[in-house]
Design a protein with these regions (language model features):
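Fold-level signature of zinc-dependent metallopeptidase catalytic domains
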Residues: 17-21, 107-110, 142, 148, ...
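Well-ordered beta-sheet/strand-loop patches within structured domains
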Residues: 154-158, 171-254, 260-262, 326-422
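Auxiliary, metal-adjacent structural segments of Zn-dependent hydrolase domains
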Residues: 5-9, 23-103, 217-254, 488-494, ...
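Long, internal scaffold/assembly segments composed of regular secondary structure
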Residues: 231-330, 334-335, 339
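Post-HExxH zinc-binding segment in Zn-dependent metallohydrolases
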Residues: 130-193, 197-199, 283, 287-301, ...
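Active-site His/Glu-centered metal-binding helix of metallohydrolases
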Residues: 120-129, 285
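Short pre-active-site segment immediately N-terminal to the catalytic Zn-binding motif
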Residues: 102-119, 272-278
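Non-catalytic terminal regions of proteins
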Residues: 103, 110, 114, 130, ...
Length: 510
């Protein structure tokens, strides 16, 4: 058997197509699996589906899930993708992979055998092993039950459409989707979700929720002197950032079926929470392993030069990083940065320089495979960059930082890729992947339980960044769910409170 560091050439080469058959896919998959085991890639069982370009667009529109509940936004996304694809303005992914157990990978039937092999290595072993082993996915998602839960969600929402009308359900989903990013439990692990459990608990949950809402909003009159100190306290006692959860539990006018739909959207949002924080790592890990596995097969003599030329052409396009002044520049390519960093970690372990030993004394000269698995398991994009971004990668990418201070009428280049700027570049870049800096900090601050039942939201700006003008439309969705007046406040740097919006607006006011 070939080892990682010493491989013997094998004269038996696999067919390089370009056409493929299912039998040939099985042969390639067996070889990829053999090599993946040499590198200790621990994966879920995988399920490979070969689909057409139109089916791939359909998967695009339903956020990559094999099944989903009906909503107009998915159809809009499909039409948009189809139009761009047919006019040559947008390509399609060669694959889509789903964090489930078994891990489902969709491959395009138009792919050549080379691209099918690349995608199997990328998705079935790269992404798959990341889903199974990264701490965020282990802690915050349950791969074994997501498909079952989506089946439950589609069935339930379809039944609601039949019972209460498509328009009524659609309006509710519109509001839930508008607040989807504010439906995540970030500090406690969510309960596992499954089709059987949801069906069993649904009725009891509906009854319990309604009883709790009735208790909260009981309207029996009390004399003023009977008020206690506890009743005068602010509700909720602490600010709440999970808006959908708060609405599900406390909105006065929502019916039990509406609360269940809020819960469904909230659970789906929770499922995607880790993916938003690991794009660089996830894509970098998958790219590193498709590159390593296919090069391993070439070194063994299993694949041809023609196969490698096609593979390297595609790989090079994937990891290309346009310069900042290119018309094609749209930010840092997560494939490029992630791949470069994992490659660099391997280099630091195998052939460290004096610079590497100074910056990374714990990993310089260590076992590269063990270090890579450690980095994959225990970090997210923000901490991964903060921990492992090396001066060499900063120089290769020619990173520099631009300071855009709203209090000044100029931009400042505050750091470049040199000795004085390395740490600032690393800190600034890692902070760009901190979700707390990317999404507005809006929390439920107060509910007037004994007055007009109004809800107060409070926005705390990051670096004095104002809210988008679309806040008025979003506030309408909050009002639809809450059922009473909603106010949006801003807490300024000096501690003062400013009223930004009120929904519905009052005459002579906002």
């Amino acid at each position: 058997m070939a080892t990682i560091d010493s491989m013997n050439k094998d004269t038996t080469r696999l067919s390089d197509g370009p056409d493929w058959t299912f039998d040939l896919l099985d042969v390639y998959l067996a070889e990829i699996d053999r090599v993946a085991k040499l590198y200790r890639l621990d994966t879920y069982p995988h399920q490979i589906e070969v689909i057409t370009s139109e089916q791939m667009m359909d998967a695009y529109s339903s956020v990559g899930m094999p099944i989903n509940y009906p909503h107009w936004s998915f159809g809009k996304k499909f039409i948009e993708t189809e139009r761009l694809y047919k006019h040559g303005q947008q390509g399609l992914a060669y694959e889509i992979v789903i964090n489930s157990n078994p891990c489902i990978a969709y491959l395009m039937e138009e792919n050549t055998i080379t691209m099918q092999a690349l995608m199997m290595a990328h998705a079935c072993y790269g992404h798959n092993s990341f889903f199974k082993n990264n701490y965020l996915f282990r802690s915050w998602t349950d791969a074994s039950s997501i498909v079952d839960y989506l089946i439950f969600a589609r069935k339930y929402i379809t039944e609601c459409e039949e019972r209460y009308g498509v328009d009524e359900v659609e309006r509710l989903l519109d509001s839930c989707h508008a607040l989807m990013n504010y439906g995540v439990d970030r500090y406690k692990r969510p309960q596992k979700i499954s089709l059987q459990e949801e069906k069993a608990r649904q009725k009891s949950r509906e009854e319990y929720l309604q009883s709790q809402v009735n208790m909260l909003w009981r309207t029996l009159p009390k004399r003023e002197e009977e008020k206690t100190v506890a009743e005068a306290r602010r509700y909720p006692s602490e600010p709440q950032e999970n808006l959908l959860y708060f609405m599900e539990k406390n909105a006065p006018l929502l019916e039990s079926w509406q609360r269940e739909i809020l819960r469904i959207v909230r659970k789906v949002s929770q499922y995607f929470y880790p993916q938003k924080q690991t794009q660089v790592m996830n894509e970098g890990w998958a790219t590193f392993w498709h590159y390593t596995i296919l090069n391993h097969l070439y070194d063994e003599g299993k694949v041809t030069e023609r196969f490698m030329l096609e593979f390297l052409h595609s790989h090079t396009n994937v990891v290309f990083q346009p310069p900042y002044n290119s018309p094609w520049y749209s930010g840092i390519n997560p494939y490029a940065l992630g791949f470069a960093m994992f490659q660099d970690i391997k280099r630091i372990c195998q052939s460290p320089t004096e610079e590497d030993k100074y910056w990374f004394p714990d990993i310089a000269g260590s076992d590269w495979l063990e270090t890579l698995h450690f980095a994959m398991r225990d970090f997210k994009d923000e901490s991964f960059i903060s921990q492992f971004l090396s001066p060499k990668v900063m120089r290769d990418f020619r990173f520099f930082t631009v300071l855009d201070d709203d209090r000044h009428n100029y931009l400042e280049i505050s750091a470049i890729h040199n000795e004085e700027g390395y740490r600032e570049i690393r800190n600034r870049l890692s902070s760009q992947y901190n979700l707390s800096n990317l999404e507005p900090n809006i929390q439920i601050w107060n509910v007037d339980l004994r007055g007009d039942r109004s809800l107060t939201l409070r926005y705390i700006p990051h670096n004095r960044a104002p809210l988008d003008r679309g806040r008025k439309e979003v506030l309408k969705h909050v009002h639809r769910l809450w059922g009473f007046d909603v106010m949006l406040e801003q807490q300024n740097e000096d501690g003062s409170i400013e009223l930004l919006e009120r929904c519905p607006p009052r005459m002579g006011n906002l």
